[in-house]
């Protein structure tokens, strides 16, 4: 079993914790709740360090997703966990029960899900790392797009030109997403080409051997 690097998690609406889970005891729960009270309400990600632990928060649309992790877990695994929890929580409660739920009222329904997502992220660090790298590359492309747009605005170029350039930059992101598929297809064709060449060489060698044994084309005589 993987090392227990994720130790506590909760989902809150505003400052009201709707569901939480941990297998441990400690003051990390009260520290996480205190940090929640001071978080900005804007959509963002936050990480605080305290006594060998990180307190990681994902704030989106009035809900806050939190996980407390040991320092050695880094940032990729905790943030990947928060993204998974956010998606699962929104699928189950988006626009419904979560909007009016009372404090800790979702523990029975969703507490076990927090545990499952914790265990999955701790058991699959390599997969989490690969996904994080892909997302980072996509974010880098988007970052370049936004940076270029800001430069255009600084130079005072016309809006119609800005629209054209934005479309071109969006196509860069699309090209990146299809790059992996194209590379796999190219490798498959190269593989087949090599196999066909090898097969042709083998057939040619067999024919040469047969002809040399039979004395040319007079085998049947």
From Swiss-Prot:
Annotated keywords: Cell membrane, Coiled coil, Endosome, Membrane, Protein transport, Transmembrane, Transmembrane helix, Transport
Domain v-SNARE coiled-coil homology stretches: 130-190
Record-level GO cellular component terms: early endosome membrane; plasma membrane
Membrane topology, as annotated: Single-pass type IV membrane protein
Presence of keyword Cell inner membrane: no
TM annotation in the entry: 197-217
Family annotation (SMART domains): Longin
Topology feature Vesicular, residues: 218-221
Pfam families in alphabetical order: Longin (PF13774), Synaptobrevin (PF00957)
UniProt superkingdom: Eukaryota
GO biological process: protein transport; vesicle-mediated transport
Tissue-level expression: Highly expressed in stems and roots. Detected in flowers and leaves.
Subcellular localization, as worded in the UniProt entry: Cell membrane; Early endosome membrane
Residue span(s) of domain Longin: 10-114
All ranges on the Cytoplasmic side of the membrane: 1-196
InterPro entries, alphabetized: Longin-like_dom_sf, Longin_dom, Synaptobrevin-like, Synaptobrevin-like_transport, V_SNARE_CC
UniProt keyword Hydrolase, yes or no: no
Similarity comment: Belongs to the synaptobrevin family.
Task of the protein: Involved in the targeting and/or fusion of transport vesicles to their target membrane.
Record-given protein name: Vesicle-associated membrane protein 722
Organism of this sequence: Arabidopsis thaliana
Top-level taxonomy: Eukaryota, Viridiplantae, Streptophyta, Embryophyta, Tracheophyta
Gene name, Swiss-Prot/TrEMBL: VAMP722
């Amino acid at each position: 079993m993987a090392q227990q690097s994720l130790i506590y998690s909760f989902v809150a609406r505003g400052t009201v914790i709707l569901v939480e889970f941990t297998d441990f005891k400690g003051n990390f729960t009260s520290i996480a709740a205190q940090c929640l009270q001071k978080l900005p309400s804007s959509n963002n990600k936050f990480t605080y360090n305290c006594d060998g632990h990180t307190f990681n928060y994902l704030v989106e649309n009035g809900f806050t997703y939190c996980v407390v992790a040991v320092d050695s877990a880094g940032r990729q695994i905790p943030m990947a966990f928060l993204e998974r929890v956010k998606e699962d929580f929104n699928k189950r409660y988006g626009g419904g029960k979560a909007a009016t739920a009372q404090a800790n009222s979702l523990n029975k329904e969703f507490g076990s899900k927090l545990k499952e997502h914790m265990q999955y992220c701790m058991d699959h660090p390599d997969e989490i790392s690969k996904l994080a790298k892909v997302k980072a590359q996509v974010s880098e492309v988007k970052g370049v797009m936004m940076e270029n747009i800001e430069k255009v605005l600084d130079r005072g170029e016309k809006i119609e030109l800005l629209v054209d350039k934005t479309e071109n930059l969006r196509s860069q992101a699309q090209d990146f997403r299809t790059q992996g598929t194209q590379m796999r297809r190219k490798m498959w064709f190269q593989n087949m080409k090599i196999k066909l060449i090898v097969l042709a060489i083998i057939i040619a060698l067999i024919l040469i051997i047969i002809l040399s044994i039979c004395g040319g084309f007079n085998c049947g005589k």
